[in-house]
Amino acid sequence: KRKKIKIQEVESSVFKVIEGEEESYTIKLNSINSSKKKHRKKIFKTPFFGVTFIGVGSGFSVDKQNSSLIVWAEDKGILIDIIADNNLILSSYGINNNAINHVFLTHIHSDHDAGAIENLLEEKKTYLITSRIIYESFLRKAQALTSLSKNNIEKFVKLIEVIPKQKIKIPGFTNTFFEFDYSLHSIPTGRCKITYSKGNTKKIISHSGDTKYDIPKIDTWFDKGSFTQNRKNDLLGFIWDADLIIHDVGGGILHTNYESLLHLDKKTKQKTVLVHQNEKPQTKSQFRYAIDGETISLIK
């Protein structure tokens, strides 16, 4: 036989629960921790030209977000890669996601492209800056994961195609330019230089993408005939003439080791910030290690 339950308010926010003829327990609602906590909304100040690091870890880091960053230019953002939970992370930093519609997709590995799939499922329009071969790989992956047709995907993903060594003005920007090249990785992977130029003001931010920068190994592969002289020169160059250089520093045999960068001159080291971190920063490092959520301004 089921007992009848009676709930009686004995005073404001205090209730007795009575089962049958016996009082079972008392509930004080004002003693229950409220889930409605007051959150002070973060105010994020966007640099006119600079970067914010969304994440700085490798795909195997346990204590860092996967590597992704925003290049800010003309009060708008360009994501370099877009990681899982991107929109949630941006919100936690106080960043308005509506100010960021462009994504440079370096390559198709899940620690770099998961957020693009999420945007697609949320029907958020994305301008995808990448090469044709990387874009075609993205389409195949997106179709396999979502069962959407190419036509449906392209309702929300617009390709801005880039070709190695051809500088373009980024659509939607007035004085911001993008230059693409391929890095050295296990699959086709891009790197870039983003330039703001107006009058006498010119600043460049470069990004290595995932890459194996290792001069002795590249020399060996060249000697074996794996590269042309031009390709070798490109692999060892392209990014170093920037005002801010963002470089891969680990996560496997096809990534750059810290020691492979030590030959760089002092001026270049001072301009270089390390991401895709797979290990703890070196003690007394000659380079700056980026931090999740950090912003660097070149033009305020």
Where are these regions (language model features)?
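Cap/insert and terminal regions of metallo-dependent hydrolase folds
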Residues: 1, 214-300
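Catalytic metal-binding/acid-base residues of hydrolase active sites
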Residues: 109, 134, 184, 212, ...
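Core dinuclear metal-dependent hydrolase active-site scaffold
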Residues: 1-95, 161-240, 294-300
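Active-site flanking residues adjacent to catalytic metal/cofactor-binding acidic residues
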Residues: 80, 106, 207-210, 247, ...
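Short internal beta-strands
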Residues: 126-137, 271-276
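Active-site metal-binding motif and surrounding structural segment of the metallo-beta-lactamase
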Residues: 77, 84-133, 236-246
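Active-site neighborhood of divalent metal-dependent phosphoester bond hydrolases
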Residues: 134-161
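Hydrophobic/aromatic beta-strand patches that form the interior of the parallel beta-sheet core
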Residues: 52, 104, 129, 160, ...
